[in-house]
Amino acid sequence: MKKLLFFFVALLSLVAATAAANAKRSIMELPPFERAVLIIKKFETLHKPKHWPYVGYGHQVQPGEPYRRGVQLTERQADALLRKDLRKFCALYSQYGKDSILLACLAYNCGPGVVNKSSVLKKLKVGNRDIFKAYTAHCRYKGKFHKQLYQRRLTEFAVLFSI
């Protein structure tokens, strides 16, 4: 009887694990904008009030915006703010077509001023799409190499750059 019960428990866990594995979707099945949102959420995480002037998923509070120091945004508010910012940056770089989402992600993290002066944008302007080295070079924080930023750039490039 114990063997039969053990067999059914093992069978049930196998069926449950298989169903859960089938429910997972590949990030590559999502539209590029949704992929970018997921990548930013993974690497930024939801900021706490102690990270002021950054709120949500890394949004830098600008003068005149309604966000107050010491107030935590909900996940829903942070997601809406992230999408709004990312759409704004996508529109800013829309003339670069399929590369606009990659430039928007870089601008979300570094700021549009950095992107506008970058070798990535200069290469894309002249039609050179060999930007891997230039894109992954944006991995420094306070002048020092930052492994997590490098990992982020690799992920963004692998998931968002299309040939």
Labelled PLM ranges:
Residues 1-4:
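Positively charged n-region of N-terminal signal peptides that target proteins for export
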Residues 53:
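Short, His- and charge-rich active-site/binding loops that engage polyanionic ligands
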Residues 56:
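Residue-level detector of conserved, well-ordered beta-strand and adjacent loop positions
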